């Protein structure tokens, strides 16, 4: 094509700028117009003033309100006016043009929602934000997402052998494994750089939590895919509600939002109200932020001012309430999912130090919707120390107990909510010696009586046996507490109920001259480990059975406590029972020291089953199990057949000893599963056909059991004999 022809075509093409519509392209590319309003803020809620007084009000804003925030440009204030009764009156709006963007951003952060004057609360926004709000379309259009079925998040509970899983974190690798007693663990998944700090399980074991510089990730299902993600930069701590509905995250660093108009701001879950906050409460199902909080006041004596007592919030048993204490002042109780304060105000309690929720939701009766909360306050001037029980949401005081000469208190709820033990550390009037006693609230009884267990020593540790009225304590004389080799006493107590005599907690037995300082009750009760943790020279483990079987055991005895084993794990830093209460793991982690890092697995008697020395070992955590769905009747039926189950389990243990037997057993289970599936389909089809033809359904009488017998043929020997013609 000749150049002359091209020039002729260009002359014929006439395009006017006003005819070009690029609005759709601007919306698609999220183009921000350079309007130059980044430094302008709009303040709503200002006092209504006459036009003659506007300069006085501007001077008040500059010198009193905005002096520590930023400098406003010369003639940078503007107030719109309207005519009222012959006078020009302001509309309660003020425009302020700052010298830089930082001043405008800080003004929004510091003044928005704050009561600046007695009857005036400011609402502050940047002018760019208002422009964006005005451009919001009248009709909302949403993008439809294709439904994807989720994996079964509790599939591990269907394991044929009923095994438990655990996490092993070493170096930069995280692995999930099946426990196989003394055999090498069966690895399920192993990933590199799965987390950047540490890992943890949710309370029921549904999710595995990994923490990263940008936030939190939840993992689960058979494929261990990502279930949820929560953006929280530099997150340090995570806590779940008991039923895994909500999640609380906390970071040393407050959240900072990108400048208005920045593309990254649109992808963040945070609003302007969340800026500068450290703690966030999330709804796990939706991924929404329910509420954000600023960092609480730091404890006195913290070296760098970055110490925090975790968890900041404590949850009620039913996930309905979470509460936080402001030491010395109040307890704030929030209701989910709105996260609004109950009755819109905190519970003012002078001197309050700590509180604990009752671990069950029916402590006040099955029909009651009230949750029980216990707190304590120290002695203040002429007022005694006090322990109180209050119900939420009514905030009614259920029971109080005054205490004297108190140094400290610790609250210990029994797992069923039947008892609350308050460990009270007391001092003599001369304050030269200290001792402890136990104030036990019997929650289920009328008027909640309080029983006092007096002791001569200082109680160092306390532990209830799960779902029981027995407990153990470690105590020592206050004169030897500061010595290098402290000898402690291990004591057991139980609740005695006899006819014609008052019920009371009675001492059972004491083991003296021990070195233990920590107690770990098995999740199912009966067994306990007394350990020495935190020492640089002693790493003792002692295993106890509270119901040791002997011929001399008295039928009405509260317990028959017997030491059934002992062990030592050099460098031990952590101890944990598995969810079944059959195994105990002790670990030595690199976060404390670099000596013989790894873990040991023992049974409940203390017999060593397996030991693994792993360099840069960081964590060993058993996967929790949700509460059992079995009823008391189901449990009784299982106990009746326990001998049959034991015989079956022994046979399976023998079969599992070789890999060939394991493969054969797995193949048989697969065939039985396929046959059972086919059988269920046939039964359903036959039932449908009988219903169509009017025939009654085939049922098995309730008093009879359906028995499926499997016949397995095995070749014991094979011999070939020649046959003569």
Curated annotation (Swiss-Prot):
Subcellular location: Cytoplasm
WD repeats: 190-229, 304-344, 347-386
Post-translational modification Phosphothreonine, affected residues: 136
Domain RRM: 39-129
Species of the source: Schizosaccharomyces pombe (strain 972 / ATCC 24843) (Fission yeast)
Keywords: Coiled coil, Cytoplasm, Initiation factor, Phosphoprotein, Protein biosynthesis, Repeat, RNA-binding, WD repeat
A GO biological-process term: translational initiation
PROSITE patterns: RRM
Keyword ATP-binding recorded: no
Family: Belongs to the eIF-3 subunit B family.
InterPro entries documented for this protein: EIF3B (IPR011400), eIF3B_RRM (IPR034363), Nucleotide-bd_a/b_plait_sf (IPR012677), RRM_dom (IPR000504), RRM_dom_euk (IPR003954), TIF_beta_prop-like (IPR013979), WD40/YVTN_repeat-like_dom_sf (IPR015943)
Function: RNA-binding component of the eukaryotic translation initiation factor 3 (eIF-3) complex, which is involved in protein synthesis of a specialized repertoire of mRNAs and, together with other initiation factors, stimulates binding of mRNA and methionyl-tRNAi to the 40S ribosome. The eIF-3 complex specifically targets and initiates translation of a subset of mRNAs involved in cell proliferation.
MF terms (GO), sorted A to Z: RNA binding; translation initiation factor activity; translation initiation factor binding
Subunit structure: Component of the eukaryotic translation initiation factor 3 (eIF-3) complex. The eIF-3 complex appears to include tif32/eif3a, SPAC25G10.08/eif3b, tif33/eif3c, SPBC4C3.07/eif3f, tif35/eif3g and sum1/eif3i. This set of common subunits may also associate exclusively with either moe1/eif3d and int6/eif3e, or with SPAC821.05/eif3h and SPAC1751.03/eif3m. The eIF-3 complex may also include SPAC3A12.13c/eif3j.
Name of this chain's protein: Eukaryotic translation initiation factor 3 subunit B
PANTHER family: EUKARYOTIC TRANSLATION INITIATION FACTOR 3 EIF3 -RELATED (PTHR14068), EUKARYOTIC TRANSLATION INITIATION FACTOR 3 SUBUNIT B (PTHR14068:SF0)
Segments passing through the bilayer: none
Positions in coiled-coil regions: 630-671
Main location: cytoplasm
SMART domains: RRM_1
Positions where Phosphoserine occurs in the chain: 23, 135
CC terms in the record's Gene Ontology section: cytoplasm; cytoplasmic stress granule; cytosol; eukaryotic 43S preinitiation complex; eukaryotic 48S preinitiation complex; eukaryotic translation initiation factor 3 complex; eukaryotic translation initiation factor 3 complex, eIF3e; eukaryotic translation initiation factor 3 complex, eIF3m
């Amino acid at each position: 094509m000749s150049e002359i022809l091209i020039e002729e075509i260009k002359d014929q093409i006439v395009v006017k700028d006003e005819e070009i519509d690029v609005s759709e392209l601007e919306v698609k590319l999220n183009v921000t117009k350079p309007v130059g309003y980044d430094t302008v803020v709009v303040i709503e809620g200002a006092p209504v003033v006459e036009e003659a007084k506007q300069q006085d009000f501007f001077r008040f804003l500059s010198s009193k309100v905005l002096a520590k925030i930023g400098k406003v440009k010369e003639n940078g204030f503007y107030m719109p006016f309207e005519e009222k009764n012959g006078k020009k009156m302001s509309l309660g709006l003020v425009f302020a043009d700052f010298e830089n963007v930082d001043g405008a951003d800080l003004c929004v952060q510091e003044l928005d929602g704050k009561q600046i004057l007695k009857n005036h609360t400011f609402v502050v926004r940047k002018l760019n934000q208002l422009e964006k709000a005005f451009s919001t379309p009248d009709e909302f259009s949403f993008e439809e997402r294709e439904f994807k079925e989720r994996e079964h998040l509790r599939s591990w509970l269907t394991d044929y052998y009923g095994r438990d899983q655990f996490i092993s974190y070493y170096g930069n690798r995280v692995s999930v494994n099946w426990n196989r007693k003394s055999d090498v663990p069966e690895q399920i998944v192993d990933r590199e750089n799965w987390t950047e700090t540490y890992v943890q399980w949710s309370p029921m074991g549904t999710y595995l939590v990994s923490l990263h510089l940008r936030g939190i990730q939840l993992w689960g299902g058979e494929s261990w895919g990502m279930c949820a993600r929560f953006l929280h930069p530099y997150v340090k701590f995570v806590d779940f509600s008991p039923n895994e509905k909500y999640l609380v995250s906390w970071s040393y660093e407050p959240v900072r939002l990108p400048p208005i108009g920045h593309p990254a701001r649109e992808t963040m879950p945070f609003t302007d109200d969340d800026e500068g906050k450290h703690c966030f409460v999330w709804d796990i199902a939706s991924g929404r932020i329910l509420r954000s909080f600023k960092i609480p006041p730091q404890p006195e004596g913290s070296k760098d001012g970055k110490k925090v007592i975790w968890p900041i919030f404590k949850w009620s048993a039913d996930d309905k309430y979470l509460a936080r204490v402001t030491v010395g002042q109040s307890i704030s109780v929030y209701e989910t999912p709105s996260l609004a304060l109950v009755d819109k105000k905190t519970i003012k309690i002078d001197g309050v130090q700590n509180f604990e929720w009752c671990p069950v939701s029916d402590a006040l009766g099955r029909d009651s919707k009230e949750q029980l909360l216990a707190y304590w306050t120290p002695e203040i001037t002429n007022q005694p120390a006090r322990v109180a029980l209050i119900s939420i949401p009514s905030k009614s005081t259920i029971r109080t107990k005054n205490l004297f000469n108190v140094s400290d208190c610790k609250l210990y709820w029994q797992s069923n909510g039947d008892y609350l033990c308050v460990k009270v550390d007391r001092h003599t009037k001369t304050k030269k010696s200290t001792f402890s006693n136990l104030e036990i609230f019997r929650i289920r009884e009328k008027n909640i009586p309080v029983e006092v267990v007096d002791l001569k020593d200082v109680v160092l540790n306390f532990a209830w046996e799960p779902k029981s009225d027995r407990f153990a304590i470690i105590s020592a004389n206050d004169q030897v507490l500061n010595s290098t080799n402290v000898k402690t006493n291990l004591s057991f107590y139980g609740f005695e109920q006899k006819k014609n005599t008052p019920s009371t907690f009675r001492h059972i037995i004491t083991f003296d001259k021990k070195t233990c300082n920590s107690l770990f009750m098995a999740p199912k009760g009966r067994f306990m480990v007394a350990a020495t943790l935190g020492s640089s020279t002693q790493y003792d483990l002692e295993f106890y059975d509270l119901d040791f079987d002997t011929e001399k055991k008295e039928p009405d005895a509260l317990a028959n406590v017997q030491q059934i084993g002992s062990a030592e794990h050099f460098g031990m830093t952590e101890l944990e029972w598995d969810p079944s209460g059959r195994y105990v793991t002790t670990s030595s982690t690199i976060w404390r020291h670099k000596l013989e890092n790894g873990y040991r697995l023992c049974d409940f008697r203390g017999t060593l089953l397996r030991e693994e020395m792993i360099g840069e070992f960081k964590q060993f955590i058993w996967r929790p199990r949700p509460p059992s769905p079995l009823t008391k009747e189901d449990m009784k039926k299982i106990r009746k057949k326990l001998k049959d189950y034991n015989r079956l389990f022994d046979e399976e243990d023998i079969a599992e000893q070789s890999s060939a037997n394991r493969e054969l057993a797995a193949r048989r289970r697969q065939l039985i599963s396929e046959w059972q599936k086919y059988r269920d389909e046939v039964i359903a089809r036959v039932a449908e056909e009988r219903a169509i033809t009017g025939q009654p359904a085939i049922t098995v009488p309730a008093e009879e059991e359906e028995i499926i017998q499997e016949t397995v043929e095995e070749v014991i020997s094979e011999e070939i004999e020649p046959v003569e013609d």
